[in-house]
């Protein structure tokens, strides 16, 4: 079988994944949650919302250095406390196909499953396919995927070259 070619791969730094499920007021909860992150200068590396059979879910990932704040925030909000799951440490593995092929999604899921690599989340677009995995499984995932997908080692961004942080400094 021919390998599927992709344009590149990106691995994130160590993250914390937060799942908020079965939310009564998703818009209000998401708005307040995002406001709390913004007020505390915390950037989200990943955000996804979905609704299945009337149940709402928000999944987001933030830098692991914010783990303490996230845990405190969830403990302080009754709506969050009873509907949250925190998974850490996690990381994002993003594949950049030349053209999106459904075959790449199926093949990736099959390879990760056969390698017993837990999948905590997934998002896709025309230009990328992103998996939330245990942080310590990122390199193993690349190795396993490399057996079925043509990955140029030169096009693997192992960690972000630039880290962006928010600042309270105001323009004068």
Report residues per predicted region.
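A conserved regulatory-domain signal marking ACT and ACT-like small-molecule sensing domains
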Residues: 1-172
């Amino acid at each position: 079988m021919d390998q599927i070619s992709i344009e590149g791969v990106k691995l994130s730094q160590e993250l914390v994944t937060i799942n908020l499920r079965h939310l009564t007021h998703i818009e209000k909860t998401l708005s307040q949650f995002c406001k709390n992150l913004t007020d505390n200068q915390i950037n989200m590396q990943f955000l996804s919302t979905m609704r299945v059979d009337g149940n709402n879910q928000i999944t987001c990932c933030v830098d692991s250095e914010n783990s303490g704040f996230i845990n405190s925030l969830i403990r302080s909000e009754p709506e969050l406390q009873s509907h949250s799951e925190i998974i850490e440490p996690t990381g994002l593995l993003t594949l950049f196909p030349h053209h999106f092929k459904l075959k790449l999604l199926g093949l990736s899921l099959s390879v990760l499953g056969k390698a017993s690599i837990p999948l905590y989340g997934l998002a896709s677009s025309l230009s990328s396919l992103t998996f939330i995995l245990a942080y310590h499984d990122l390199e193993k995932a690349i190795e396993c995927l490399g057996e079925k997908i043509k990955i140029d080692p030169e096009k693997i961004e192992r960690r972000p070259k630039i880290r962006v942080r928010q600042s309270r400094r105001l323009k004068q």
